[in-house]
Amino acid sequence: MPRRRGTPLPTILLLLAFVGGACGTEILSKSRLESCSHDSDAGGRLKCDRKLVVDLAVPSGASGGEASLVARVAGVEEENDTPSATKSIRDPPVITVSKSATYALYALTYLDRDVAYRPDEKYVKTHKCEPYAGAKVVGECERLWDEKGNVIKQTEPICCPCGPHRVQSKCGDIWSKLTKGKANTAHCVRFPGDWFHVFGIGAWSLRFSIRVQVKKGSSVWDVVVGPENKTVVSGDNFLRVKVVGDYTGYTSIPSFEDNYLVTPRKGTGSSQPQDLGNEHSKWMILDRVRFTLDGLECDKIGVGYEAYRNQPNFCSAPYGSCLGNQLWNFWEYDKRRIDNSQLPLYIVEGRFQRINQHPNAGAHTFSVGVTEDLNTNLLIELMADDIEYVYQRSPAKIIDIRVPTFEALSQVGIANVTTKNIGKLESSYSLTFKCSSGISPVEEQLYTMKPDEVIARSFELRSTTDQAAMHQCEAILKASDFSELDREGYRFSTAATVYNNGAQIGPTNDHKKGGFWDSIKALWRNLIDFLTGRLCWTKCPRLFDFGCHIQYVCIGWILLLLLIPAAVVFLWLLHQEGLFDPLYDWWGLEPDDDYRARRRHQKGRHHRHHHDHRHRHGHSHGDHHHHYHGGHHQRRRHHHPPAWDVEGHHHDRQQHSHEAGRNHHRGYGEVVAAGAAPLRLDRASRPGQTEVDAVVEYRERRSRHERHGGHGHRDGHYSPSV
């Protein structure tokens, strides 16, 4: 296995694997091997003949946050080779770069001045108010003394007459004036509650730190660089890192040179604060013009006793004059903005990110996070005297490809390709996974395999459509000289994207609100859609797909399939009962006469039996009217008497009616006996006449009867009809 050490190599290729928050890391230029004699003395020199130079663009994380990346030197190219070939490094160095969050640092200057959060005017209604009066007369507006017992100037009360002046007060009657003196009011300003430190803010400076770790074999080197320490060399002179600078200037870093920072006072007294604390919700940055550091201006932060006492027209001015535009006014204004989901104008919290999170934060510095995403140019130099390269070529093959089905767009698929070195030498290989369409291109992978070694490499697959599809791909394995060793095709499918609104159920467009009847109509439409199966048409397009119908409860399809045979059976039963005979007569469709005759003969026997039973029932009651009613009921129920029974039955009923008329005077019992005479049925009017002939003769007789007005045999008591 031939090797070469320290060969002049003009170009180094890097294989980058990104981790952490890095999202846009890139190689600025192809890294190179240079002579160490070119080094300057700035920051120290490397002890080597050759060095590997890597030029990187290190980005910031999201909103200027932390970021990290891993760069692995995978192979080299020699321009003198024809054709150009990439050779792998046996023990490639791995470079890990971690960049901290970027922030702007400001120097703070304490102004030896604390200000009250909310100055408050006090007043007392009294009599005989004087600037030097005691507490019995002016109450809490009595003048103040310092720790040494000296009167604090300008703390005396201001006396205003009674009446409609600064404070409305009654002057009292004459007796009160004589006994107590003239009524008046005493006014003063006091500073209760919280106090705040005031700081001047200097110019900003950019701060971040970049930690570079190089691992080669079992050895690890670490250095940390930043804007304040741009070049650092490791202790054994193996590694040197330099911050070249940022490619573009920052535009969103605020300048506070015309502002003051106020923070709540910690402890007592107004001496130099040692700790700013972390109550960022009370920190405010305000314009300098809003402050009066000597206390001589009204309506400014820091107003003092003198400005309050010496304001013009004091007694005629409104109550609380000279005490406007204080810290509490700005804080409450911002609080209302925050409650209305607006950004504050003065409060630090919510206006900036990563407040005072810089290392070694104290009372002399203040920092805010920088949200711009800018790249930092980083130059890394490694000693390259002992780098070894692998040149041999060995055959290999692809032994397995697996791609589990995944959901398009919402999921990332994994293609696992397993390769094996089937040769006798250790060699480097390149592997790629290419798909015809629908899958985004993937990056080629470089790696080394020993003889008979099996290695599985993974590729992330991302679909470019949300539809289910079948994809045709190929895994291509190449040798160290980039000649193709093996190629295997593979087909896999992706499932369609399932869209889910989560807790936000429903479409994004607004629906028009309807009234009560609109709700009823919508409910009715949904019911019709459910019963008719309209909702299932898209899921079960085939009529006889019973499994699908049951799965999606397609009641419309199921009922339709069940109603078809039920309707056929029902129509056949109606046909058996003769319900369609009038239709047959109307359309001229005559069923088999023998069949109809037999069916009507059976019905006729049933009717005669029922008629005889009704007659016997009338005799048992012995009531002629019951008999008549029974006959009438029989006529009403039997609209279609049998053809062979009509003539004989009609004749018997006429005879029965005449006999009943003649014997009516004989008595009740005789009438019943006459009515109980059995009816005779003439099946054939003439010898040799068949039942079918009797039917035809009956129809002709009935037709003549209807042409003559439909009059039958009648008497005074009973008129039977056919």
From Swiss-Prot:
Keywords: Cell membrane, Disulfide bond, Endoplasmic reticulum, Fertilization, Lipid-binding, Membrane, Signal, Transmembrane, Transmembrane helix. Disulfide bonds join 36-48, 129-159, 141-188, 160-315, 162-171, 298-322, 435-473. It comes from the Eukaryota. The chain crosses the membrane at residues 553-573. GO terms for cellular component: endoplasmic reticulum membrane; plasma membrane. The C-terminal domain (583-705) can replace the homologous domain in the Arabidopsis protein, while the N-terminal domain cannot. HAP2/GCS1 family members mediate membrane fusion between gametes in a broad range of eukaryotes, ranging from algae and higher plants to protozoans and cnidaria, suggesting they are derived from an ancestral gamete fusogen. They function similar to viral fusogens, by inserting part of their extracellular domain into the lipid bilayer of an adjoining cell. This is Protein HAPLESS 2-A. It comes from Oryza sativa subsp. japonica. The lineage of its organism: Eukaryota, Viridiplantae, Streptophyta, Embryophyta, Tracheophyta.
